[in-house]
């Protein structure tokens, strides 16, 4: 199934935020977990704030301070669907 760029962009941002919450909190760890290109990982991290998600960056190690406009419980319940849409492991 083909998904819109809007949907995949949104899912990618919340998935990376979820990964950070799970301890996959550096660009190399995100790349290893997802196989996404480095630039995609960096661009995703740079765009997460557009969802009002508050990340702290401490020398390349990220931490979620606030999920903002995103319901973290919904993400936790639907993480397998999110990964399937993005075709990530």
How should each PLM-predicted stretch be described?
Residues 9-16:
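Short, leucine-enriched amphipathic alpha-helices that occur as contiguous helical runs
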Residues 21-26:
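Short capping segments at the starts of secondary-structure elements
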Residues 45-50:
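Residue-level detection of the helix-turn-helix DNA-binding "recognition helix"
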